[in-house]
From Swiss-Prot:
This is Probable pectate lyase 1. Pathway: Glycan metabolism; pectin degradation; 2-dehydro-3-deoxy-D-gluconate from pectin: step 2/5. Its cofactor is Ca(2+). PANTHER family: PECTATE LYASE 1-RELATED, PECTATE LYASE 18-RELATED. Its EC number is 4.2.2.2. GO terms for biological process: pectin catabolic process. The active site is at residue 307. Residues 1-20 form the signal peptide. The keyword Lyase applies. Keywords: Calcium, Glycoprotein, Lyase, Metal-binding, Signal. Belongs to the polysaccharide lyase 1 family. Expressed in flowers, but not in leaves. GO terms for molecular function: metal ion binding; pectate lyase activity. It comes from Arabidopsis thaliana (Mouse-ear cress).
Length: 431
């Protein structure tokens, strides 16, 4: 019997090993295909100020319509919140759920989620097998390779054994049911596009990992430890996080890293957490320069400490949010992010050493004085103050638009229904 050469035996063993590992790839940044810089940045807009102006214009129009109708004595369900005014007034919202996909604003306005797909009804709250999930479960829905609009048959508490890895073109729509994702793994949006997460209670998320988890119909892989974020956005684009109630997680409530962009985070109620929102991977990760995020109409509520958000490199439009509590600071950053704060209400805590809204993290003033951090039309209460820098601080910044953030006095009203709404069929969706 002929003896095969050693080099040939080694090659055969290698090929066998690669084939065996086809479905068990280590799902980290090094194992996934790299894009060139043009592809990576293709979802970022060239003039982010134009997108910010569009948000202001939509808000101004909604506020004006709401105010004028009330003056004329008409009942109106309008709130001055252009997202909500787009769909919430319809008592038959449940018959036209996909209308929501046309209501986005800001950098994530083009996120269509599963609009062009069929409905998938989650009937089973269990999560027995993260590699081979049973039909009817949320995990089985989100891994499908086709667009889906995911809804829930009834109220349920879903305790995930591992992080829930969401595939592209998915909407998770909790309206009409009281849906909690809690006490286990939570949501990961990794290297995908067009995802909408709406109407969920996400809390008490735990670190998970060192396990196999399925991410699509055709792929599962070994996952290292996840941090325990409520929602983790990783290298993804066209993502909209709207009307969720988020609290008590091991790491962040919403984190977006590794070049994620075209994101809107809106109408959420965030409470009881330390490091709330991280936007940007690290000071040395240059691809986060393309990160563009709109943070609008959220209520940053009781029990929050810092990072609302904490930004790196990109462009961040913080508009018409209600900051009623923080313990250290509200908005922080490093690595020269642009922060455009407009029409927010900042109510400082009683602590005399925590009145400043802003914090430049581990950076001397000689560096951050050139960063473009600007405050326009913000309502500063209880001694709160915003330290501007860059062109805004020097007085040389001039808006190309005549728009201004005029609605800070109405922020309490605009954000009064932030968080997951108790929607019921046949009624307008309101708290």
């Amino acid at each position: 019997m002929a003896v095969l050469p050693t080099w040939l035996l080694a090659m055969m063993c290698l090929l066998f090993f690669v084939g065996a590992m086809e479905n068990t790839t280590h799902d980290n940044i090094s194992s996934l295909p790299r894009s060139d810089e043009t592809e990576w940045n293709q979802h970022a807009v060239t003039n982010p100020d134009e997108v910010a102006d569009e948000v202001l214009a939509l808000t101004e129009m909604s506020v004006r319509n709401h105010t004028e109708r009330r003056k004329l004595g008409y009942f109106t369900c309008g709130t001055g919140n252009p997202i909500d005014d787009c769909w919430r007034c319809d008592p038959n919202w449940h018959k036209n759920r996909k209308r929501l996909a046309d209501c986005g604003i800001g950098f994530g306005r083009n996120a269509i989620g599963g609009r062009d797909g069929r409905f998938y009804v989650v009937t089973d709250p269990r999560d027995d097998n993260p590699v081979n999930p049973r039909p009817g479960t949320l995990r089985h829905a989100v891994i499908q390779d086709r667009p889906l609009w995911i809804v829930f048959k009834r109220d349920m508490v879903i305790q995930l054994k591992q992080e829930l890895i969401v595939n592209s073109f998915k909407t998770i729509d909790g309206r009409g049911a009281n849906v909690h994702i809690a006490n286990g793994g939570c949501i990961t949006i990794q290297f995908v596009t067009n995802v909408i997460v709406h109407g969920l209670h996400i809390h008490d998320c735990k670190p998970t990992g060192n396990a196999m988890v399925r991410s699509s119909e055709t792929h599962f892989g070994w996952r290292t430890m996840a941090d325990g974020d409520a929602i983790s956005i990783f290298g993804s684009s066209h993502v909209w996080i709207d009307h969720n109630s988020l609290s008590h997680c091991a790491d962040g409530l919403v984190d977006a890293v590794m070049g994620s962009t075209a994101i809107t985070i809106s109408n959420n109620h965030l409470t009881h957490h330390n490091e709330v929102m991280l936007l940007g991977h690290s000071d040395s990760y240059m691809r986060d320069k393309a990160m563009q995020v709109t943070i609008a109409y959220n209520h940053f509520g009781v029990g929050l400490i810092q990072r609302m958000p904490r930004c790196r490199h990109g462009y961040f439009h913080v508009v018409n949010n209600d900051y009623t509590h923080w313990e250290m600071y509200a908005i922080g950053g490093s690595a020269n992010p642009t922060i455009n704060s407009q029409g927010n209400r900042y109510a400082a805590p009683k602590n005399p050493f925590a009145k400043e809204v802003t914090k430049r993290v581990d950076t001397p003033a000689s560096h951050w004085k050139g960063w473009n951090w600007r405050s326009e039309g913000d309502l500063l209460q209880n001694g709160a103050y915003f330290t501007s820098s860059g062109a805004a601080a020097s007085g040389s910044y001039a808006r190309a638009s005549s728009l201004s953030a005029k609605s800070s006095s109405l922020v309490g009203h605009i954000t009064s229904d932030a968080g997951a709404l108790p929607c019921r069929r046949g009624r307008q969706c309101s708290s």
